Regions:
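Short tyrosine-centred short linear motifs in exposed loops/low-complexity segments
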Residues: 78-80, 133-136
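Extended, hydrophilic extramembrane loops/domains of integral membrane proteins
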Residues: 134-155
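Conserved small/polar residues in nucleotide/adenosyl-binding loops
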Residues: 158-165
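Structured loops at beta-to-helix junctions and adjacent beta-edge loops in soluble globular domains
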Residues: 73, 130, 141-143
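Early extracytoplasmic/domain-onset interaction patches
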Residues: 7-128
Length: 165
């Protein structure tokens, strides 16, 4: 069964297609569809109630001009950790880290931006999380004229080292 995004101002109903192989989520991942693709982080921070829960750490949408926003609240990190996102063919990917209601970090990348702006020289994106004893909320905005597929997960240094080749 696919979760659905409820109908709100600027957000329309759509069944979310998720992958069956992704384990169930223990973080509070939520999604907002911005049909206008015009919302900025300041707008999104005012619309937190319009985000809808995701059952999996992945989604697939057909090609469209809309933007998709992810939101997740994470506890304070005790060890070096990163947000890993695999989103092939995402044209624009914007990452925002908010702590205590303040924007702490933003990074803009994606296939339509210069390759040097990518956190890694691959289709995977890796964003460091602060180890400062404070909980955080992450927001990720994605757009693409291609089908939009994304898999995402917070990962630890140990996890990254275990997957090095």
């Amino acid at each position: 069964m696919s979760p659905a995004v409820a109908d709100d101002a600027g957000v329309s109903s759509v069944p979310l297609q998720t992958t069956a192989t992704t384990p169930s989520v223990n973080q509070n991942w939520r999604l907002l569809r911005d049909e206008s693709a015009q919302l900025r982080i300041a707008d999104v921070l005012q619309r937190k109630e319009q985000f809808r829960p995701l059952a999996k750490r992945s989604f697939i949408f057909p090609a469209s001009p809309q933007a998709v926003w992810l939101q997740v609240q994470l506890p304070a990190q005790k060890v070096p950790s990163w947000l890993w996102i695999f989103a092939p063919r995402v044209q624009y990917l914007d990452y925002y880290l908010v702590q205590d209601g303040q924007l702490v970090r933003d990074q803009h990348t994606g296939e339509s931006r210069p390759f040097q702006e990518r956190p890694l020289p691959s289709r995977s994106y890796l964003f460091s999380l602060p180890v400062d004893g404070k909980p955080m909320t992450l927001y990720v905005r994605m757009t693409s004229n291609h089908p939009l597929m994304a898999w995402f997960d917070p990962v630890s240094y140990t996890h990254l080292r275990a997957h090095e080749t």
